[in-house]
Swiss-Prot record:
Source species taxonomy: Bacteria, Pseudomonadati, Pseudomonadota, Gammaproteobacteria, Alteromonadales
Protein name as catalogued: Peptidase T
GO annotation (BP), single: peptide catabolic process
Listed Pfam families: M20_dimer, Peptidase_M20
Chain residues that bind Zn(2+) 2: D139, E174, H378
């Protein structure tokens, strides 16, 4: 299984599948569709049933049940890699029997346990790293490799009891659109798991409540030589507004269950400037208070302006899946038991972000998140442990077995 996973993963990361938040096409990049076509051919060759690729880039397939009266479950991963860092020409390095020392990434970069202490737990194991010029793509091609490997194992080992199992590989998860065209009804699962987490044992069923606030400053432009008493610089209005935001209520000062405001972007000219904030909190009441506080701050700032104006538009992005998952405790219990059966200690912690599962849970498909075995996603220091990928694959198989007992 280990060698098969390694080869499968190395094949997948050769596809550049970065998504593009500026492109409104679905998927946002054609390369994701090319990768999905490759996976479709692989699934057909492996004798998966009902293999379908939609024109939106959603790839689904089925492992038929071999026992009756068992809930249908699903496993989900995403095709795209983050637009944050280059995903072109990925040249993975395979480090066998890691010795605990610095790993040279190509010519100019280093992956060091002094900076990334998580490396220390993988001495003697096989790591896959970047060459320092791109991200690796473990997020989420490790998840794809693990799902296909696990479900193919079930197909070729009919002595393992399981119900109907569905898989889906989605486009554009990294830009928040992975669930936009997901057909929950046709997927036909009672619950599912995204395979999109990090270190071994991660089991996540809480995520941020999330919103985006667009604040627009309106000014008045004229020739700077005749600007006295006439010019109103929208950029100055925007900058002074941001100076009123709390300095410590930001991502770099928050952790665990802390929420935050994050200035994601600012741009403008004299006539018009925009500030884009993301708002995050795990607690729904505090989340609503954050949105209200920001709206009231804009109103107060406008009242103090003699000229110029700010407007605000707040849009919710996704909500904490906890409210949709906890009413179905067996979904979590089965995943925990599967890990424990394999000698894995479950690590239950909140996702300081979102997944396809957070939106799918509110679309009627409760969907916690499980580990892939990767670290340092979205950058040149990303790496994956192959032995951890094996454990993720075994966890998927064990979940299928335990679900067959849950009648």
């Amino acid at each position: 299984m280990k060698q098969q996973l390694l080869e499968r993963f190395l094949s997948y990361v050769s596809f550049d599948t970065q998504s593009d938040g500026q492109n409104q096409n679905v998927p946002s990049t054609h390369s994701q569709f090319v990768f999905a076509q490759h996976l479709r051919q692989e699934l057909v060759s492996l004798a998966f049933e009902d293999v379908q690729l939609s024109d939106k880039g959603y790839l689904t397939a089925t492992v038929p049940a071999n026992v009756e009266g068992v809930p249908s479950i699903g496993f989900i991963a995403h095709l795209d890699t983050a637009p944050d860092y280059s995903g072109k020409n990925v040249s993975p390095q395979v480090i066998e029997n890691y010795n605990g020392e610095d790993i040279q990434l190509g010519l100019a970069e280093v992956l060091s346990p002094k900076q990334f202490s998580s490396l220390n737990q993988y001495i003697g194991q096989t790591l896959i790293t970047t060459d320092g010029t791109s991200l690796l793509g473990g997020d989420d091609k490790a998840g794809i490799a693990e799902i296909i490997s696990a479900l193919h194992h079930l197909l070729t080992h009919p002595e393992i009891p399981h119900g109907k199992i569905r898989l889906c590989f989605t486009p554009d998860e990294e830009i928040g659109r992975g669930a936009d065209h997901f057909d929950v009804e046709s997927f036909g699962a009672q619950w599912a798991y995204t395979i999109d987490g990090g270190q071994v044992g991660e089991l996540e069923y809480e995520n941020f409540n999330a919103a985006t606030a667009m604040i627009t400053a309106t000014g008045n432009n004229c020739h700077p030589g005749t600007a006295y008493g006439v010019m109103v610089n929208a950029q100055t209005i925007a900058a002074r507004f941001h100076a009123k935001m709390p300095l410590k209520d930001t991502p770099e000062h928050s952790r665990d269950y802390d929420g935050f405001f994050h200035l994601l972007g600012m741009e403008g000219v004299t006539e018009k400037a925009t500030l884009t904030y993301i708002i995050r909190d795990f607690d729904l009441e505090l989340f609503e208070k954050r949105k209200q506080w920001l709206t009231e701050l804009v109103e107060k700032y406008n009242a103090d302006l003699s000229i110029g104006q700010l407007t605000i538009d707040v849009q919710d992005s996704y909500l904490n899946m906890k409210q949709q998952v906890l009413p179905h405790p067996h979904i979590i219990d089965i995943a925990k038991q599967a890990m424990q059966n394999l000698g894995i200690e479950p690590i239950i912690k909140p996702i300081r972000g979102g997944t396809d599962g957070s939106r799918l849970s509110y679309m009627g498909l409760p969907c916690p998140n499980l580990f892939t075995g990767g670290h340092n996603f979205h950058g040149k220091h990303e790496y994956v442990c192959v032995e951890s990928m094996v454990k993720a694959t075994e966890t998927i198989i064990e979940i299928a077995k335990l679900t067959a007992e849950h009648k």
